[in-house]
Amino acid sequence: MFRTLDDANVQSKRVLVRIDLNVPMANGEVTDLTRIERIVPTIAELSRKGAKVILLAHFGRPKGVASDENSLKHVVKPLSKVLDHSVHFAEDCIGDKAKAAVDALKDGDVLLLENTRFHKGEEKNDPEFVQALAANGDLYVNDAFSAAHRAHASTEGLAHVLPAFAGRAMQAELEALEKGLGNPARPVVAIVGGAKVSTKLDLLSNLIEKVDALVIGGGMANTFLAAKGLDVGKSLCEHELASTAREIMAKAETTKCAIILPVDAVVGWHFAADTPHQTYGVDSVPGDAMILDAGELSTDLIASAIDDAATLVWNGPLGAFELRPFDTATVKVARHVAKRTKEGKLVSVGGGGDTVAALNHAGVVDDFTYISTAGGAFLEWMEGKPLPSVDVLKK
């Protein structure tokens, strides 16, 4: 297990809290507050318990160079609004400016330090930079699971030099992931969709050793269909990965993991919304058409696999969900998962950028057991890779 805020005495302590503020911006305004909302419980609890709360975060990819566009000062207003608490700001995360701002804090105050990536030492996990950050703290709390796969100074380095704890968002994520794949109720079904097999090879290899059934959808399903000798017409397909797809299917047989591929497909002749479309069996896709979604027989097949499951892990859409009506399979299956979850019959964990967008589109994002907003870290966890900044929090 890992250390949480329950294990920490924070009264009058300077607590460095690593958070995720990599929020979408347009014209200097934050356009989506989801990530800010996720960190409220940790900051509010620390402030309530009388800690001096010092927030560390990165924004964008400034590569060690300070700039106005990547400054965290733009986030101060929305952050204090969501927190319902005033937030002080320091124009640097180390050195005199940071020290002066920290020294001025009273118990319960909240201070945001400037972008950690304005210093090259952040991404290099440079020991001198770690010490410069640590100089302003007595304890360290990591609440940024989305950066857990990066061993940077503020995500991993600090945990070696200060007493380290998981924040509430980090804790919720780790507990949900443990239920999803770490120690899940069986049978477990995974849905993996999206465009390309090439970006999900490690994921597929890991999942077939851990799950009882694997649903493959989206563009990547075409590569598997082609590998089985079927003609996928002009569909998005990585023909050069046919032998890899066959290896994955063979490995799944030995690990007793059922692979579920589409049996029918909705095809169109143009990659556009509302283009004329028709449903065909996957063995009779016209040579001049492209597969844009899974058909009704396929979604029924997936729904029945979900009915047999106790746990479901989802990464990636089942079709070109951003183009109607090719969002049908994704929406239908997502709503079925939501229904089973609400009935208490399924633990459902979803994550990854496109997945969150697709589940939002289906209107079910609040009905899953847990939705990870982490992207890369969620994928690496699904791939079974170690997460450096989580490992250092273990008791």
From Swiss-Prot:
It is an enzyme of class 2 (transferase). Pathway: Carbohydrate degradation; glycolysis; pyruvate from D-glyceraldehyde 3-phosphate: step 2/5. It is found in: Cytoplasm. GO terms for molecular function: ADP binding; ATP binding; phosphoglycerate kinase activity. GO terms for biological process: gluconeogenesis; glycolytic process. It comes from the Bacteria. Substrate binds at D20, L21, N22, R35, H58, F59, G60, R61, R117, R150. ATP binds at K200, E322, G352, G353, D354, T355. It catalyses: (2R)-3-phosphoglycerate + ATP = (2R)-3-phospho-glyceroyl phosphate + ADP. Keywords: ATP-binding, Cytoplasm, Glycolysis, Kinase, Nucleotide-binding, Transferase. GO terms for cellular component: cytosol. SUPFAM superfamilies: Phosphoglycerate kinase (SSF53748). Its EC number is 2.7.2.3. Monomer. Belongs to the phosphoglycerate kinase family. HAMAP family: Phosphoglyc_kinase. This is Phosphoglycerate kinase. The lineage of its organism: Bacteria, Pseudomonadati, Pseudomonadota, Alphaproteobacteria, Hyphomicrobiales.
